[in-house]
Amino acid sequence: MKARVRFAPSPTGPLHIGSIRTALYNYLFAKKYHGDFILRIEDTDSTRFIPGAEEYIIETFKWLGITFDEGPYRQSERKAIYKEYVDELLNKNLAYIAFDTPEELEAKRRNIPNFQYDAITRMTMNNSLTLSKEETKKRIANSNQYVVRIKIDPNQTIIVNDLIRGEMSISSSTLDDKVLYKSSDNLPTYHLANIVDDHLMKITHVIRGEEWLSSTPLHIILYQYFGWGEKMPVFAHLPLLLKPDGKGKLSKRDGERFGFPIFPLQWTDSKTGKSISGYREDGYLPEALINFLALLGWNPGSEQEFFSIDELSVLFSLKKCSKNGAKFDYKKVEWFNHQYIQKKSDKEIAELFFHFYSKKLEKQDFKKITEVIGMVKGRISSIRDLWYETAFFFVAPNTYDEKIVQKRWRAESPIQLTELSELLATITNFSLQIVEKTIRGWINNKGYHPSNIMNACRLALVGTAKGPGIFHIIEILGKEEVIIRIKKAIQVLR
């Protein structure tokens, strides 16, 4: 049988980085077994739908280079299909209609410790099991809102076979009669739509996060109620992604707390206008992020650390996935990104840099950008870092670091830099070798201290003490720009 897996996010906001790992593992599994990878948008909860979330999902995987073989399918467009299966369960007496209001349910929760709607409590509730058929039909005809609940028999043993966690058994008495359908929006809940779609789409393996493990017994019961027990997919529940300190699941709020992105792309809240950073906007390479995420919960069984997505699709195995949660080490993803940047040519990084800062660099010479990249690439961990490291090449400093001025700008600096600018004006071949030879010869002839000249010159050209070798800076900036910057610094700092 051909392997078929799916990634089924809800359009309720930005994708958590843990969801990206889940999608990646599904993708790798499909590619390894020459199967199909399907995108299904689970938008049955209309109260949580966020405009733009589906587009965000699609854009995320486009950036990552992860392609889907089918989809996106949208559950909101499949209402009629689900209603047929709801009616089937009702006709089989495997589900029932419940009219309990939110207020009535809340009162039960307040008055009964650990209340759940199950075989014990259902006969005390406001549903079709306690009402006559006539009363039930009357309420539906009068447009009374209702839900359809699954009817779970108590004292049954549910066996869950999981590729990662092995065999587990759960008593059905611990389960509640979950809501499968709501008349308020004529949509099923996640549980019913999920099972129906997985069956109709011939999903062979359900690979999802550990948080769904507790729902699996209910899903198995639904497969059995529909008579699909023999065609049930294989389950594999992935370990949680943990906070960097290992204390609990990595949440969407942890990004601000720990100071790193939790989302693949930037997300802007349509209500508040607040933007939350993403890995793409922070200058990360998609291949670096994929490599990092692949190793969060899966081990290839070797010392190898760097994998292309094609290599991963060959090596990936659910049997090598861990049961235990994986700490999210942000320093590690920074390290991976640094390594992947070093692997690229200066031209490739320059192209990324140019695209990343297109407005700031639109008038710059691409050759100059490439030369600049070659000097600073070894020091950066993201494309965004490049602007911090190289901005002075493209934009003259408007201010000068006060601490550096006090430390490096001397009383004689204006006179010395005036002489230097006059010297530079005489150079016709402004190559690195000629510039360095000329300046060093002038320093020796004048008896100046080299560091005093170099430090003051760097301050004038850069505005602070950072940057590559001063002669490289002078060559790339060019004679005219260097002289302009020196004169400006003398005027401002005199």
From Swiss-Prot:
- Where are the disulfide bridges? none
Q: Name one GO biological process term.
A: glutamyl-tRNA aminoacylation
If you read the UniProt record, what top EC class would you report for this enzyme, in one word? Answer: ligase
- Provide this UniProt record's keywords sorted from A to Z: Aminoacyl-tRNA synthetase, ATP-binding, Cytoplasm, Ligase, Nucleotide-binding, Protein biosynthesis
Q: Motif 'KMSKS' region located where?
A: 249-253
* Principal location listed in the UniProt entry: cytoplasm
Molecular function via GO: ATP binding; glutamate-tRNA ligase activity; tRNA binding; zinc ion binding
Q: Which SUPFAM superfamilies does the record cross-reference, listed alphabetically?
A: An anticodon-binding domain of class I aminoacyl-tRNA synthetases, Nucleotidylyl transferase
Residues reported in the UniProt entry to bind ATP: K252
One GO cellular component this record assigns the protein to is:
cytosol
Record localization: Cytoplasm
Q: Where is this motif: 'HIGH' region?
A: 9-19
Entry EC number(s): 6.1.1.17
Give the catalytic activity. tRNA(Glu) + L-glutamate + ATP = L-glutamyl-tRNA(Glu) + AMP + diphosphate
Family, per entry = Belongs to the class-I aminoacyl-tRNA synthetase family. Glutamate--tRNA ligase type 1 subfamily.
Mind telling me which PANTHER family this protein's record contains? GLUTAMATE--TRNA LIGASE, GLUTAMATE--TRNA LIGASE, MITOCHONDRIAL-RELATED
Which function does this protein serve?
A: Catalyzes the attachment of glutamate to tRNA(Glu) in a two-step reaction: glutamate is first activated by ATP to form Glu-AMP and then transferred to the acceptor end of tRNA(Glu).
Q: How does this chain assemble?
A: Monomer.
Q: Could you tell me what this protein is called?
A: Glutamate--tRNA ligase
Source species, please?
Answer: Azobacteroides pseudotrichonymphae genomovar. CFP2
